[in-house]
Regions:
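Short loop/turn segments that connect beta-strands within beta-propeller blades
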Residues: 58, 112-116, 169-173, 224-228, ...
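Blade-level signature of beta-propeller repeat domains, shared across WD40, Kelch, NHL, RCC1
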Residues: 377-383, 389-414
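A short beta-strand motif characteristic of beta-propeller blades
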Residues: 22, 61-80, 117-125, 174-184, ...
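Loop/turn-rich, solvent-exposed surfaces of beta-rich toroidal or solenoidal domains
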Residues: 299-337, 341-377
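Bacterial Sec-dependent N-terminal signal peptides
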Residues: 13-40
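Beta-propeller blade signature
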Residues: 159-170, 216-226, 271-281, 328-334
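Repeated scaffold domains used in trafficking and secretory/extracellular systems
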Residues: 30, 76-89, 128-136, 186-195, ...
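Short glycine/acidic-enriched loop and turn motifs that connect beta-strands
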Residues: 46-49, 103-106, 149-154, 208-212, ...
Length: 414
């Protein structure tokens, strides 16, 4: 879905929350686990203020207020956090968390999860509202950052075209380059997410109009890691507003969820452009294996994020408008049978109307023996599920208990 719709939906229903900055609880030593993450970072926010907590892989809270928008020079922050934070979804250097501060700030922050010390901050706005969406570290000297925002007056600063893929040297840190994304007449490219597949990075382009009044079909663009350049374009025919292409545990299958164009209240007009696409990651370029249209799955639009539970089961969420008669629902989908199983429904807002975007980030590492966690803004908790033979079994919810902000995202770190 569009970031604007998410902010509008959640902020409107959280308006009036009286939260006070919690005392920072600092870093935490968690054991390294090889390819399995050592912990989870949870971003809680009312989109005015924000807080990051650190959890053990099983969901136990280890540092409820690791960092927050109240953080100051005690952490080495030159630019304080805003209320619109994200955390890099892919692996970076051991123990380090990369925090993306989006609208209004446009800064990357590199922070040690063990000590809470900030190694560096890097402004990446280059003179315009860049709105960074993701961070993918490929080596100690190379990382990619998709910038959603476009610059209507480029040419005043280096690397200021916008709606591009920025190249970063994390060791300095510094901006070292920019890769333009393919443009369609009347639309911005809007790169929203990145994932590494072999020697390429697949960039999801959402192709929105400048005023976000509509969208074109999404596509995946492959960019080579060595000597970065565009290698191919893969249209996601018939689907709009798609999210990150997620790899299955075996890395043989890619799954992409698409929500359709979402207006400022979270409503969808063209349900037929929402769905879930499976691609064969072993072919070059990836070949479509199967698609599940929203009209066939649950009769409601999907949110544009998905999470593999096992090789054959994924989690997906429905998209509902602010104040509607419907609420977000969380489903497990069996990719072999096509059967969807309802796991949870969002709580109603205090005014009795639909909460809008209630279910946020998801994280599953069943292969590591870890539970699945799903951010639930409507209950201000993380839903927790154990995975038993492709089945998800509800366990005790997780309460972060920091400044009282609801969790919006949950992301692994190594």
């Amino acid at each position: 879905m569009s970031r604007l719709a998410f902010l509008t939906s959640a902020a409107a229903l959280l308006l009036g929350c009286n939260v006070s900055p919690a005392r920072l609880t600092g870093g935490v030593e968690l054991p390294e686990r090889g390819d399995c993450p050592r912990g989870l970072a949870v971003v809680s926010t009312d989109f005015l203020s924000s807080e990051i907590a650190l959890l053990a892989p099983n969901g136990d809270v280890k540092s409820p207020a690791f960092m927050s928008s109240a953080s100051t020079v005690a952490n080495g922050l030159a630019a304080p956090f805003s209320g619109d934070l994200g955390v890099a979804t892919a692996r970076s250097r051991p123990g380090e968390l990369v925090v993306l501060d989006r609208l209004g700030t446009n800064v990357l922050t590199f922070v040690d999860t063990r000590t809470g010390a900030v190694r560096a901050q890097l402004p990446i706005g280059t003179g315009f509202e860049a709105n960074p969406q993701d961070y993918l570290e490929l080596s100690e000297q190379e990382a990619f950052v998709p910038r959603l925002g476009d610059n209507r007056s480029p040419g005043r600063e280096p690397f200021d075209a916008g709606s591009d893929l920025l190249i970063i040297d994390p060791s300095k840190p510094a901006i070292t380059g920019s890769i333009p994304m393919p443009r369609r007449p009347g639309f911005w490219p809007n790169p929203a997410a990145v994932v590494q597949v072999g020697g390429d990075v697949l960039v999801t382009l959402q192709h929105a109009r400048a005023d976000y009044s509509g969208m074109d079909e999404s596509e995946l663009v492959a960019v080579t890691i060595e000597n970065p350049r565009q290698r191919y374009q893969l249209p996601l025919t018939g689907l709009e507003n798609c999210g990150r292409a997620e790899l299955s545990p075996s890395r043989a299958v890619l799954a992409v969820a698409c929500s359709a164009f979402v207006d400022r209240k979270g409503a969808v007009a063209k349900l037929e452009t929402s769905g879930l696409l499976l691609l064969d990651a072993t072919t070059d370029p990836p070949r479509e294996l199967r698609r599940f249209l929203a009209t066939e799955l649950v009769g409601e639009p999907l949110q544009s994020s998905i999470e593999f539970v096992t090789e054959h089961v994924v989690l997906f969420k429905t998209q509902t408008a602010l104040g509607s008669e419907l609420d977000n629902q969380l489903f497990a989908l069996d990719l072999e049978t096509g059967k969807s199983t309802l796991l949870a429904s969002a709580a109603r807002a205090s005014n009795g109307l639909g909460f809008g975007i209630a279910f946020g980030g998801m994280s599953c590492r069943a292969g590591c023996g870890d539970p699945c966690l799903v951010a639930d803004l409507s209950r201000a908790k993380l839903l927790r599920f154990e995975v038993e033979a492709d089945e998800l079994v509800p366990r005790a919810d997780v309460e972060v208990d920091g400044a009282g902000l609801p969790p919006a995202a949950v992301t692994p770190f190594w």
